[in-house]
Amino acid sequence: MRKKLTALVLSALPLAAVADVSLYGEIKAGVEGRNYQLQLTEAQAANGGASGQVKVTKVTKAKSRIRTKISDFGSFIGFKGSEDLGEGLKAVWQLEQDVSVAGGGATQWGNRESFIGLAGEFGTLRAGRVANQFDDASQAIDPWDSNNDVASQLGIFKRHDDMPVSVRYDSPEFSGFSGSVQFVPAQNSKSAYKPAYWTTVNTGSATTTTFVPAVVGKPGSDVYYAGLNYKNGGFAGNYAFKYARHANVGRDAFELFLLGSGSDQAKGTDPLKNHQVHRLTGGYEEGGLNLALAAQLDLSENGDKTKNSTTEIAATASYRFGNAVPRISYAHGFDFIERGKKGENTSYDQIIAGVDYDFSKRTSAIVSGAWLKRNTGIGNYTQINAASVGLRHKF
């Protein structure tokens, strides 16, 4: 009996040593379908006989078939813990990893938010792959789960969300206010960017058009983030800011806003400069009601001193009825300004509607439908329709 008791105590010692380590994550997957529709309007010259050339308009419409597949909706696993160092100081750490129940996915550990740091009365200081302030604010405005982050999530609006390799400081809360600053060294920032483009080759017997993907090069520049938060009862507010002097990373974000419209084809676009982003988010929670509103301004400068800017708004509302939580989101991007000129009919509109049904505190069914229309000029647009149904389990 004594031997059994001794063995039991010894086996419990390793568990006690790691008692401050938490295992957590989400497994979520389902079936999703999507299709694309587009319209291209071209002005052409036609022979008008005695009257000479007559301009006519050619309208081309196309629609893809509905593509349906089983997808992972962003599953991940994480470990986090802390150690009391005495005198109110403690070490904190976290390691998160993307996983996929649909196979494939990331192969490197720590590809989500992963860091080590110190926390105390002074606040929290972390280094590693740390979420930026835009990612923090998006938790309220975009709670959707999907494999299609452009249409079935507010992917265009959230294009500045990131988890860069950086150092971040978060202050303690003072009368509901708290702040944060974050620094990304140039060697850890995203690489310089040469825009993707289409090239046409004539071999004599045939003409082929090939898509050349974006090319990365040397590191860009230091990137700075800052955030200010306020919370009072059911109300919460957040301001997020980003600045990069040599904004090579900005071109990626601007092209995402354009949804790959090819606007930079043959223009020799330089990497962007003085790239700054401002986002203001406000939310209210009362009982089963959740409301969130956000506005975002994206500013940048080209090598020839001309300016680019985009302005967007987004809103999300949900209400709990027993186990069901119906939800709707809307986002709108106004006509952008590129190289100092307003792009006519270059706005976008997006609607996502769905419902979560909780079988328990940890397991839910998730259903959503999405519609995104991106105007790419007068008479031109790209439209994405998507729907998904799946299951999510939190642990």
UniProtKB/Swiss-Prot annotation:
Residues 1-19 form the signal peptide. One of its GO terms (biological process) is monoatomic ion transmembrane transport. Keywords: Cell outer membrane, Ion transport, Membrane, Porin, Signal, Transmembrane, Transmembrane beta strand, Transport. One of its GO terms (molecular function) is porin activity. It is found in: Cell outer membrane. InterPro entries: Gram-neg_bact_OMP, Gram_neg_porin_domain, Porin_dom_sf, Porin_Gram-ve, Porin_Gram-ve_CS, Porin_Neis. Serves as a slightly cation selective porin. Major antigen on the gonococcal cell surface and it may have pathogenic properties in addition to its porin activity. This is Major outer membrane protein P.IA. It comes from Neisseria meningitidis serogroup A / serotype 4A (strain DSM 15465 / Z2491).
